[in-house]
Design a protein with these regions (language model features):
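Hydrophobic alpha-helical transmembrane segments
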Residues: 10-16, 202-204, 208, 235-240, ...
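Membrane-interface helix/helix-cap signal primarily in integral membrane proteins
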Residues: 2-5, 58, 62-257, 485-486
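Short helical patches
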Residues: 3, 196-216, 370, 444-447, ...
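Hydrophobic alpha-helical transmembrane segments in multi-pass membrane proteins
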Residues: 14, 22, 57-64, 180, ...
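Membrane-embedded alpha-helical segments of integral membrane proteins
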Residues: 7-53, 463-467, 471-505
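Proline-centered turn/helix-capping motifs that create local helix->coil transitions or kinks
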Residues: 222-226, 305, 328, 371, ...
Length: 540
């Protein structure tokens, strides 16, 4: 079975596009086309593909069939997933056992948390639970089992929603099928069996309990509320303590990604792992340790789409480095997307998934164009200026591809994002390294009193840095014209903006190639290296 032309260079990219199209078709026809039809279509097309491959004929037809098989498989996966979430509600109280899988959030009159039902009619599903009398729930933490009796109901999505944000889609991504209000006398803590939960979910639950312990130790230090909330969000993905004011500050400054675990945070942790392993990172043992630590961290912080994408990308990168093969960024990104969508096709509509992949795609496409010019190469070898120029290029590339989505979902356009990123990214790197050191030293405080003093001193220092960063971001967010709010766009405008971006990037790339051919500019990485060496010699 052969791929022809440029298909060999971007195999997974084309497959990912076909999978995405298939998922969209399956979702649009979910009510009209049964799951069985998509299943049999997938089996039939796959059988035909195998027959053509064995006969070694019609290679172009084989390529076309591969794409059709992928599309049919995507439609099959999404329709099966959506059917599994459909539940009927009786309107009567039901007895069930469940386990707490998200950090409880205190509301005005209740406490909200996410439950995974392990026994009862909705066993295997998740639901949003609202507990009466929140003051009595201080002891409820992630991993606790409960036995309750309440009425399950659907969600009311008739209220107006600004922008393109769809709460129904977001619940579908998380597998939440119902909501329930639990009276104070209708539940109790209980030892529940987790056999109904998949093994990966049980492992994630155990690691999230460890995450809660780390958060408790951090909360016990003398940190301000905003400092604690910022560190918890940056390191362990817990945003429950982030106030509306702090969230608004980061949004207006254009650095909301700092509070959401993504490639930036996992990249810092990956660099830390590589530094600790040293030369052994390129061995089989080093590769296994790296993959184990990366995915353990991803499970511990909740497996959000952004962190899963980052973990998959760094896994591919580590594997390619070990095999000493070229690291094809576009193919690796497409491979990560395909694996994630096959595992959970509804993730396609997750806002974090979309923004994460588009940001990386922007970096993949535009950062290469930005760095392939003499200005970048002239300063790339300089330690401080080179890193600053690289940071600006990455921020511009990511913002270009993410901005239309931000306008579509949130109606916010930050104008000082470059300045904010120059401030936030280096400080975030320091904060994550220091926070990880805090987590490692925390257990040692039980054995030596002087270690407690050192730990508190270090925590105070980290808290001071976080406070200064938050202050600087507040100043940036308060500058005149820092952001434009209420700039919502429609789905059609969103599509047209991305068409325009792709067209501009194409023209930019074509113009750069024409300029290179006319002026004899460098075209290869070897030429870039020669120019860097020449720049160093001239400077010396």
């Amino acid at each position: 079975m052969k791929f022809n032309g440029k298909l060999q260079l971007h195999t997974f990219l084309r497959i990912a596009i076909c999978l995405l199209v298939g998922i969209c078709i399956g979702d649009a026809t979910a009510d009209a086309v049964p799951v069985a039809l998509w299943r049999w279509l997938f089996v039939g097309l796959l059988s035909l593909l195998v027959l053509l491959h064995l006969s070694k004929r019609l290679e172009m037809m084989q390529t076309l069939l591969i794409f059709c098989v992928v599309m049919a498989g995507g439609a099959w996966r999404i329709t099966s997933y959506e059917n599994s979430l459909r539940c009927a509600f009786t309107g009567e109280e039901e007895v069930y056992e469940a386990v707490v899988v998200s950090q409880p959030i205190k509301k005005r009159r209740s406490m909200k948390c996410e439950l995974a039902v392990v026994s009862g009619r909705l066993a295997g599903h998740r639901l949003n639970a609202y507990f009466q009398n929140p003051n009595s729930l201080n002891r409820i933490v992630v991993g606790d089992g409960i036995k309750a009796q309440s009425v399950f109901s659907g969600f009311d999505d008739t209220y107006a929603q600004r922008g393109g944000f769809d709460w129904r889609r977001q619940r579908m991504v998380r597998g939440i099928v119902a909501r329930t209000f639990v009276a104070s006398d209708k539940w109790k803590r209980a030892e529940v069996s987790l056999e109904a939960m998949p093994r990966i979910d049980r492992l994630a639950l155990s690691l999230q309990s460890l995450r809660y312990d780390l958060l408790s130790r951090l909360q016990g230090s003398a940190l301000s509320e905003d400092s604690y909330a910022t560190i918890a969000a940056m390191t362990l993905g817990d945003k429950t303590g982030v106030s509306a004011e702090l969230r608004d500050t980061y949004s207006k400054a254009g650095v909301s990604h700092v509070l959401a675990l993504s490639g930036l945070h996992l990249g810092i942790i990956y660099a830390m792992i590589a530094l600790l392993l040293g030369r052994r990172r390129n061995t089989m043992g080093g590769l296994l340790v790296t993959l184990l630590l990366v995915w353990t961290f991803a499970l511990m912080v909740g497996m959000s789409p952004g962190i899963v994408r980052s973990a998959a990308m760094f896994s591919v990168y580590a594997s390619m480095t070990f095999l000493q093969r070229d690291y094809l960024t576009a193919n690796s990104l497409a491979l990560a997307a395909s694996v994630m969508l096959l595992a959970s096709p509804a993730m396609l509509w997750d806002v974090g998934f979309q923004m994460s992949f588009l940001a990386v795609m922007g970096i993949v496409i535009c950062h290469v164009l930005l760095r392939n010019n003499r200005f970048y190469v002239r300063y790339a070898h300089r330690r401080f200026v080179g890193k600053l120029v690289s940071l600006v290029c990455i921020s511009l590339a990511a913002q270009l591809f993410v901005l239309p989505l931000v306008m579509y979902y949130f109606g916010n356009v930050p104008f000082y994002f470059l300045l904010a990123n120059i401030v936030a990214v280096p400080l975030t790197t320091f904060i994550i390294y220091a926070a990880m050191l805090l987590f490692v030293l925390s257990p040692l405080c039980r054995f030596a009193a002087w270690m407690t003093v050192v730990w508190q001193w270090l925590a105070s220092g980290v808290g001071w840095v976080v406070a200064q960063m938050n202050t600087l971001l507040k100043v940036i967010a308060s500058l005149p014209g820092a952001s434009a709010e209420g700039v919502y766009i429609s789905a059609l405008q969103l599509s047209l903006m991305y068409v325009l971006i792709v067209a501009l990037v194409g023209v930019w790339r074509y113009g750069q190639q024409m300029y290179d051919s006319m002026h004899g500019k460098f075209k290869s990485e070897d030429d870039l290296k020669k120019l860097r060496i020449k720049s160093k010699r001239v400077k010396e």
